[in-house]
């Protein structure tokens, strides 16, 4: 593919991102406008290359600014939106302390931001691209081959590794990253990690990799199937993920109506509806129009 075609594709991708389009959307728009010089897979490869180049430039800018005592130009705020399960996954790695100072096991996890379900989690001795790729292969298999439209992560070395990003883009997945040093750009997975570490059963220190892996596996099962999450109207993540919350919602409506009929004086004429999970979830996104 010629450099001029690559440049035009990169221009379409950049313009599409400004207009709220992902890579596939920009490809379709260009196609509608009569530009068809490369396959969608090639567009994904070019998009990944552009991101890597931008990351290199941004890192150099940060380093130069730090040396000169100047403030680096802020990265554009990421915006992702999900209106259903398996549209957007977020992932991260957190430390699980051991008895040795400065030594921690690494817990990897992927969460669906719409349903809050932990798709898959694992624990390893260290952070590595190979383990991250294995995590995503396991997640895709766990969802019956379904892949998300977007994967969001922070700016860790593994999260920005070329091999991982090429693996994701090869599966047609758009990659999104938090801004450097912005703590609330990856809120869903951070919230899940806080839940993991704030439970009464959390040991605080892990004696072995097996112990850490066992704790995380037990936590994920509880979190997905028994944790009535306040962010999804007190349904479990598994119920929202597979849609079974709707059956329970109908039951809740019947129970509430019965309660209201027995005690009308407690409602003063106001009949509150049964809360349902929001129709969308996002990161720095105002919501669907």
Predicted stretch roles:
Residues 7, 27, 44, 117, ...:
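Generic structural signal for individual residues within well-ordered alpha-helical segments
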